UniProtKB/Swiss-Prot annotation:
Produces ATP from ADP in the presence of a proton gradient across the membrane. The gamma chain is believed to be important in regulating ATPase activity and the flow of protons through the CF(0) complex. GO terms for biological process: proton motive force-driven plasma membrane ATP synthesis. This is ATP synthase gamma chain. One of its GO terms (molecular function) is ATP binding. Its main location: membrane. The lineage of its organism: Bacteria, Pseudomonadati, Bacteroidota, Flavobacteriia, Flavobacteriales. It is found in: Cell inner membrane. Transmembrane segments: none annotated. InterPro entries: ATP_synth_F1_ATPase_gsu, ATP_synth_F1_gsu, ATP_synth_F1_gsu_CS.
Amino acid sequence: MANLKEIRNRITSVSSTMQITSAMKMVSAAKLKKAQDAITAMRPYAEKLTELLQNLSATLEGEVGGAYTTQREVKKVLLVAITSNRGLCGAFNSNVIKEIKNRTDFYAGKQVDVFAIGKKGNDVLSKTHKVHGHHNAIFDHLTFENVAGIADNLTEKFLSGEYDKIELIYNQFKNAATQIVQTEQFLPLAPLKSEVSASAGDYIFEPSKEEIVLTLIPKSLKTQLYKGIRDSFASEHGARMTAMHKATDNATELRNQLKLTYNKARQAAITNEILEIVGGAEALNG
């Protein structure tokens, strides 16, 4: 059994760790609230934009979307990996990296490159894939305008023929304890035809419907990427809060076990001292 000093040192060490994980949990909880409010507020906008685009497209004659919907033979694929800049968030990053590897296997025989958003994904995937661009600072100033520049970059890679297909892979936020890895096709767009929504009315358009659709497509792509990053951002803080909560609970349990061990060792030491004193006294009396 370890001596009393060693046990005391371990108790001090575990207590310090518990204070750190508890503080990180509270910080993540505060950040999660803001991130959750942001993604909750923008989802209806993104859904309405998609609905508007589909309703307009469904009332047009012929194929809509132009170069954005061009289906080419898939030879070169770009996977956009959205991860975090920091760790200590459970399986948050590893799940995305695992899905990147699954998609790479799915496209076996084709050129598969990565576009990394987040330092953790870039650090790991740069060892196994060709990384075309990485954006680590985006989370420091997460605004629609900053994400729009990245979306324009990705769109240009498709329109120029540099890549035949682009997919987004990220954690979708469900709640603090649950994040779902999503793979979404970014480009080419699926053919823009659908049933007209019951809420779609008969309107006079200025400019034409075609012009409006071609204006909405780039905005829709920017919104899709922004929503994906916002989802990932909220998921990161939820995963970190959950991980730190579990770490704090484990540290508390370990500290309690160490205290029990310490008390038993201290009690045994006192008992031995008493026995030695009694034994010495009996020897003197004898």
